[in-house]
Structure formats: C-alpha cells, structure tokens
Amino acid sequence: MSRETGAVCRMCRRSGDKLFLKGDKCVTKCVFEKRPKAPGPQLGRPRRLSDRGQQLRHKQSIRWSYGMTERQFRRFFGLATAQPGVTGDNMMILLERRLDNVLFRLGFGTSRAQARQIVMHGHILVNGQKTDIPSYLVKEGQEITVRETSKATAYFKTLAENIEAKAIPGWLSLDRKTLSGKVISLPAAGDIDARFDAQTVVEYYSR
C-alpha cells in the first residue's frame, strides 16, 4: 500500500480523533473541529462499528500519526513480535525510536511529516554521520545534530530562535544553542502517547 497522499484532515475525520498531522495548523485551522464526521455522504444515523472495525480504525490512527505505509507498519509489528516482552509496548517503543519521530519530539519539525522531509533532504547527522532514512532506529547514547551547512538556511535560523517553547520527552535531551539532541535512554512504555492503545493493533493483526 502506498503512502497516503490525500488531504490529511480527512484522516482525522476517518479516525474520529484529532491526530495533529499538520502540526501548528491543527491548532489554528482545524477542519476536524468544524466537520468531525467521517468524509462521504451522510445517510442517516451512522452504523455502529464492529469490534474488528474499531480495531482497524485505531490501527489506522496510529499508522497515520507516524506517517507510515501499511507495509512499513506491518514490518514494525513483525519486529515487535520477535522481541521479548509485551508486543504492543515493543511496537510503540520502536515507533518512537524512528529518526523522524525523534526530530519531531525534539521540536525540529512541527509535524512528523515535516521532520521526515528534514531527514530525507540530508540535513541530519547521527553521531556525525549523514543519515537520510526516516525509519532509522536511534540507539541509546546517540547524538542527533544538524549539518553545519544546513544551519545557515532560513529554516534552521528561525528554528534556533523559536525552539525554546518545545517540551522535550525525558528520554531525550536538547542543546538549543547548537541544535543538537541526544538519546539519553530508550523510551519506555510510560513515555507513549496515552491516546494510542497498541494492544488493538496486536489484536487486529493476530486474527
């Protein structure tokens, strides 16, 4: 399945929840708040979703939030299943370790989509090595920095002035002066967004 290319606001409406896929625009100009119902013709009272349908909707919400294709998402589920421990927690921890998500958490992008573009355009170094793969899984102790040539661009100059307001998760640290972050520890189950119940993903793929 290819990456979703349609209007991202429709994904929020289809999921029935505000996913903040457009970053700051979701605060100031939110289509979901005006039209929270699913897209398409509204023919009377909406049907009640089956348990399977609810699992699918929740699985899609997590997948869309992290900006992944179904194939990528299923691969991460396979990786989580192969690890010891709780599969749902394992999967969410893997998703949090993605480089594009780490940049988003550090405040380098207002959305994961923007953070993914920053990675793909070659602006980011991991332990001094250029890394342009958004799905790269960071490890404990690694340092994430912006290339010196990239710091001279208008985007990163503005970022350096405005990044102060971003709250950083406890498993990451940020040096705002140098625009560099560090993975202090790997994320734990308690660090995961409370909106996401990964157990529904496990149940969906296990049937």
Curated annotation (Swiss-Prot):
GO terms for biological process: ribosomal small subunit biogenesis; translation. Keywords: Ribonucleoprotein, Ribosomal protein, RNA-binding, rRNA-binding. The keyword Protease does not apply. It comes from the Bacteria. GO terms for molecular function: rRNA binding; structural constituent of ribosome. It holds the Pfam family S4. GO terms for cellular component: small ribosomal subunit. The keyword Lipid biosynthesis does not apply. Residues 97-163 form the S4 RNA-binding domain. Part of the 30S ribosomal subunit. Contacts protein S5. The interaction surface between S4 and S5 is involved in control of translational fidelity. One of the primary rRNA binding proteins, it binds directly to 16S rRNA where it nucleates assembly of the body of the 30S subunit. With S5 and S12 plays an important role in translational accuracy. HAMAP family: Ribosomal_uS4_B. Belongs to the universal ribosomal protein uS4 family. This is Small ribosomal subunit protein uS4. It comes from Dehalococcoides mccartyi (strain ATCC BAA-2266 / KCTC 15142 / 195) (Dehalococcoides ethenogenes (strain 195)).
